[in-house]
């Protein structure tokens, strides 16, 4: 790109999806070990913007110790005759794509969950100042969003300044989110889709409706509408809702068509209001993961910044890997925290009556949206530490899910002894045969007959 001749590293879409491993990184900015980090966009009057200016408040990249993790705030301030505050979320989310265009720079997540890494090779080439990154962002914003007439960017690493700006950023996010509450999916004829994360999750198509925020928690239905209107060929696009195929599950013909087209046929059916059968795909930037707990037939939820293991013994990273990458995994669902405030929150699965465990921090954030008769019956990490403790807690609190256990226990099952005897059961069971190995963990398999055949190669057939 000719506009980047003075930049010491290459810039282009070819670098989207580039991962920078810990051993290869110069520094980490934000991420799971840093408490306060953010990126925010604000629309300002023309006279308040110094066009093209890049400010660095605090130590610059070259001043940061190699291998360290540091707090970072990014403030993008834009002005233009056609700009209004309703476009702030649109401008802000473009940071994800634009920063990933930079060779040797990785950007993940959004808002207060941002996680960035600068690679050693790019640092050694001269990408050693936020001013260089700011120049790239300025040119990309002005080139791809012409309605931005003036733009300035501020990078903040000074902790006292971050402490000042962080609560302001959180207040801005909440203000945007609140605007979208109240509007229903049934009241609009257009949803919106986003493929910003396809560089990391090729088959992921995020469907944004009034009652279902983007997985990352950064794009509301109003943000999607604004983005599609100013950049109709961009990564956020309109989806005609189409015919309602399944009201309970949240299946729409337009969503299915868009998912199939944008995922290159990998995803053909999406149910928006359930975590089972055809759940919404998960990217990698989601704020939280819902995971099914078969022992209690309920859902647990764990957010990205949760320290330690969830009630099932697994940390967020492992649970995230179980559903990320644009896949549809039964009982696993990457989602935004804002979706937990929606009346369509897993509506087909029982909604909050199906949730049994949530970290205290998340529970406090969404407490006002949990039905009052269930809020104290949902366990947190302070109440239970294991599945057995969770079972006892749910029984003691008379959680609605317990009634379902009783019903299932009392339902007569007609089956032969052959059907109900486990073929195998073990906490970890390795099976080796024919040159391959399968490891089953905490599995009980019931079957009347199991046949495993090794497929013959052409040479063997001859």
Question: Each PLM stretch: what is its role?
Answer:
Residues 1-416:
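Cysteine-centered metal-binding/redox modules
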């Amino acid at each position: 790109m000719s506009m980047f001749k003075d930049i010491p590293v290459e810039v282009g879409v070819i670098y989207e999806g580039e991962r920078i491993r810990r051993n290869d990184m110069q520094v980490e900015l934000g991420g799971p070990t840093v408490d306060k980090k953010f990126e925010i966009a604000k629309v300002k009057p023309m006279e308040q913007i110094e066009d093209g200016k890049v400010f660095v408040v605090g130590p610059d990249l070259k001043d940061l110790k190699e291998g360290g993790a540091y707090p970072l705030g990014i403030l993008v301030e834009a002005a233009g005759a056609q700009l209004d505050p309703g476009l702030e979320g649109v401008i802000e989310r473009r940071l994800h794509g634009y920063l990933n265009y930079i060779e040797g720079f990785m950007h993940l997540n959004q808002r207060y969950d941002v996680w960035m890494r600068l690679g050693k090779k790019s640092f050694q080439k001269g990408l050693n100042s936020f001013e260089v990154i700011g120049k790239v962002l300025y040119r990309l914003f002005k080139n791809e969003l012409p309605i931005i007439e003036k733009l300035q960017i501020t990078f903040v690493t000074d902790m006292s300044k971050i402490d000042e700006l962080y609560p302001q950023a959180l207040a801005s996010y909440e203000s945007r989110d609140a605007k979208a509450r109240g509007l229903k999916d049934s009241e609009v004829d257009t949803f919106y889709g986003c493929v910003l994360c396809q560089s990391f999750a090729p088959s992921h198509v995020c469907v944004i409706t009034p009652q279902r925020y983007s997985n990352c928690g950064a794009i509301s239905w109003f943000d999607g509408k604004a983005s599609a209107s100013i950049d109709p060929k961009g990564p956020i696009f309109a989806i005609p809702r189409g015919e309602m195929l399944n009201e309970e599950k949240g299946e729409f013909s337009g969503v299915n068509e868009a998912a199939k087209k944008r995922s290159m046929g990998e995803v053909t059916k999406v149910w928006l209001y359930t975590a089972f059968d055809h759940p919404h795909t998960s990217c990698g930037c989601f704020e939280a993961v819902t995971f099914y707990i078969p022992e209690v037939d309920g859902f647990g939820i764990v957010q990205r910044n949760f320290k330690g293991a969830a009630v099932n013994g697994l940390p967020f990273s492992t649970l995230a890997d179980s559903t990320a990458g644009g896949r549809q995994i039964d009982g696993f669902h990457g989602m935004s925290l804002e979706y937990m405030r929606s009346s369509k929150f897993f509506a087909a699965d029982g909604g909050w009556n199906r949730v049994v465990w949530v970290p205290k921090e998340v529970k406090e954030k969404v407490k006002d949206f949990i039905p009052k008769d269930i809020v104290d019956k949902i366990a947190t990490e302070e109440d239970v530490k294991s599945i057995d403790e969770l079972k006892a807690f749910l029984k003691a609190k008379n959680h609605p899910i317990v009634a379902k256990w009783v019903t299932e226990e009392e339902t007569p099952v007609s089956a032969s002894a052959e059907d109900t005897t486990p073929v195998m059961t073990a906490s970890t069971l390795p099976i080796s045969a024919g040159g391959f190995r399968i490891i089953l963990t905490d599995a009980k398999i019931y079957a009347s007959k199991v046949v495993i055949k090794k497929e013959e190669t052409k040479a063997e057939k001859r």
